[in-house]
Amino acid sequence: MKSLGIDIGSSSVKVSLLDIPTGECVASATNPAAEMPIEALRSGWAEQDPEMWWHYVREGIRQIAVKHPMREVAAIGITYQMHGLVALSEEGEPLRKSIIWCDSRAVGIGAEALEEIGREFCLEHTLNSPGNFTASKLAWVKRNEPEIFAKIHKFMLPGDYIAYRLSGRMSTSISGLSEQILWDFKEERRADFVADRYGIPHAMIPDADVSIGIQAHTDAATERELGIPAGTPISYRAGDQPNNAFSLNVMEAGEIAATGGTSGVVYGVTDTPKADPQSRVNTFVHVNHTPGKPRYGILLCINGTGIMNSWIRRNVAQQTMDYAEMNRLAASVPAGSEGLLVVPFGNGAERVLGNRCTGAGIVNIDLNRHTTAHILRAAQEGIAYSFRYGIDIMRGLGLSPDIIRAGQANLFLSPLFRQTLATLTGARIELFNTDGALGAARGAALGAGLYKTREEAFASLRRLEVVEPVAADREALEAGYRAWVAEVERKIQNS
């Protein structure tokens, strides 16, 4: 008996197959071989075609099915890039490309809504400003593409769209409503006042399900095309960051997870609804939330994380080095990169900077001393500095990151990055044998009742490595961090 996990990223789509009795991943497929394109028709825009995601979901399932018959699949879980807008016609066709998470076009619309609804009311009820989230993106479509808006039957998130393609049912989740800024935390219900402010008909908002539990069943078309038996439950759905926390068994108040993909995230669980007055970090409904046992996730997002490292590889390393070689060369430079700084904020508006687009930068280059190796190290340190910057904000909300859990993937594959982050934050970093697709598969098995308890679901989760702070590097990194903060403040003033 198997569980299928699907991870819709912005760079790739991964599909993993979990053997439920052993808890082991028996197969996985990641597509495409190169990164999926992100279309940017204007500065600050970012779009992807939902049909592209669905294409690569099918490709991955077919690749796995060569050796593992899909008739063995007993549950399906989906995780996805958060906040993206998918607008569907009554026939279920996408009416435009998805405006994805790193698109900044709706920042001004969100700011207008915050002032009109009232900052205090928003922070009390939605725990966030409307910002650049999904509802604001839809309001942009209403204002700028009225002919498309008029045809919208339902709007949803990227993972909701994949669930629809598998089942024929248009739905979202309560956690999903919260990431769209359409959840009222105080009243424990949909935040219709946000939709009303934007002129969004309530009928456009899909029904919302729990994240862990049966939400829909696959249809006959999925069985014909992919071999997954009709009636297979879709029993888990979560945005990539709540899912990353779930994958690491970060479910209780005080526990903290991190990831370093295209964007970087620190996600801390609390049982008390808390809001940052400046909305630099955001609070969402966690996957195991219930009214009687509330669980919320405070999310710090740095848009320019893995994408910064990827840019450095393309434009500095000239793609002659893989990431492992880049890490080795970067490690040849001392902590602090001998004064060279990289500011990684070049992938849209950064919430942690008050929704500003400051741009990225390489600062303090000494033409007589600094080399490619310095730039490689400074890039990873700059990303770690941005994590520290946000974690200091989270500390102000009562979270204390003494231990940070992460999957051994993406930037956390870099010994230099994880060592730098541990030293800067003073936290122990624990690395585990999991990823988003595998976590979604585990969640689906739990949601379908194939695992009876959380303890059973996570029995096979293994800690692979522990990274402790390095005292000898602390002074150099603290000095680098202070200089980096000064540069960020200068960029904020000029933005």
Walk through the language-model features, giving the residues of each.
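N-terminal glycine/serine-rich phosphate-binding loop of ATP-dependent small-molecule kinases
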Residues: 1-96, 151, 223-224, 228-233, ...
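Residue-level signal for inorganic ion chemistry
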Residues: 23, 49, 76, 103, ...
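A conserved helix-loop-beta module that forms one wall/lid of the active-site cleft
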Residues: 198-210
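Short, glycine/charge-rich flexible loops or terminal/linker lids adjacent to PRPP-binding catalytic cores
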Residues: 103, 216-221
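Structural signal for short hydrophobic segments within the conserved structured cores
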Residues: 26-29, 206, 465
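Short beta-strand-loop/turn "lid" adjacent to the catalytic site in phosphate-handling enzymes
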Residues: 44, 62-101, 127-132, 159, ...
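Short loop/turn motifs at secondary-structure junctions
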Residues: 69-72, 204, 384, 400
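Active-site core segments that coordinate phosphate-bearing ligands/cofactors
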Residues: 3-5, 17, 107, 111-169, ...
